[in-house]
Amino acid sequence: MEIKCSERLIIPKEYKTELDLKETAIAIKEVKDCFERALAKQLNLIRVSAPLFVRCDKGLNDNLNGVERPVKFTVKDDNEAAVEIVHSLAKWKRMALYRYNFNADEGLYTDMNAIRRDEELDNTHSIYVDQWDWERIIKKEDRNEEYLKDIVRKIFKAFKETEEHINKLYPFLGEVLPEEVFFMTTQELEDMFPDLTAKEREDAITKEKKAVFLMKIGKTLESGEKHDGRAPDYDDWELNGDILFWNPVLNKAFELSSMGIRVDEESLLKQLKLANCEERKELQFHKMLLEKKLPYTIGGGIGQSRMCMLFLKKAHIGEVQSSIWPEEMIKFCEEKGMTIL
């Protein structure tokens, strides 16, 4: 049975935005400018230009959960070469670090735009994706959990700095982040809440802790289920995670970032086999990785519009980004006090 868009929406009781359209536009820029500077400083990153589309035969696009269809087209003046709009730049960034000759503990970030045509549209999901995609070179010996946690803490400092900046400009919005981030694995979370679904578990722990880094996503848990899917060829499933914040407007856990230490040659082979995707070994990116030509890296994506939603207390992602929405959803949101851009 088809589910109406309005039935997927969370409608906060007596919702009323604190900022009008013009004020929102100004505040969005404040959020983005502040966080971009803070992230670059914390992680020693420089900004680089990023592609909107990549060639299909290079293996550079992010396959996400493995079922999402990329938008494809051909280029007339390049012998009708097949290209596809990116889902994210997870693999492209690692290749870029190699080409730019970055050193260990240096990295890059991009202002990434993507189209995810198969997203189910609701308060937090849009077919238009805008995020900071970042990647940083690490040493082989840095491929461990403590290094991962250290990077997460640095990113959390950038979040805190941004929230404090926005709260000085708009004190009536209030702050939502705690003083520190809480770390937990997906298996520990399943053990704690065995009778809940994955999303219900995230809600339960994030409501309590307010800021959580949920680790080890993509692997099969003791229950025989995965907490969530991850492509086998960028994150190491033992060394990755999601940054979750409690969203008081929507009353649910809110994913702001998916990130991780990237696969090395051993974990790539292992995960490709587990995912039944061993044919990818013949793609350019994968060949270079297996031949140890690419640097060891850590990286992730951080949602720009979701961050604006959280800090500006917005109930729908369409209040902070311009995208395409069903007319039914636009009308329903307007009736409930959510002005879609």
UniProtKB/Swiss-Prot annotation:
Its EC number is 6.3.1.1. Coiled coil: none annotated. It is found in: Cytoplasm. The keyword Ligase applies. Pfam families: AsnA (PF03590). GO terms for molecular function: aspartate-ammonia ligase activity; ATP binding; catalytic activity, acting on a protein; transferase activity. Pathway: Amino-acid biosynthesis; L-asparagine biosynthesis; L-asparagine from L-aspartate (ammonia route): step 1/1. Keywords: Amino-acid biosynthesis, Asparagine biosynthesis, ATP-binding, Cytoplasm, Ligase, Nucleotide-binding. It catalyses: L-aspartate + NH4(+) + ATP = L-asparagine + AMP + diphosphate + H(+). GO terms for biological process: L-asparagine biosynthetic process. The keyword Hydrolase does not apply. One of its GO terms (cellular component) is cytosol. InterPro entries: aa-tRNA-synth_II (IPR006195), aa-tRNA-synth_II/BPL/LPL (IPR045864), AsnA (IPR004618). Belongs to the class-II aminoacyl-tRNA synthetase family. AsnA subfamily. This is Aspartate--ammonia ligase.
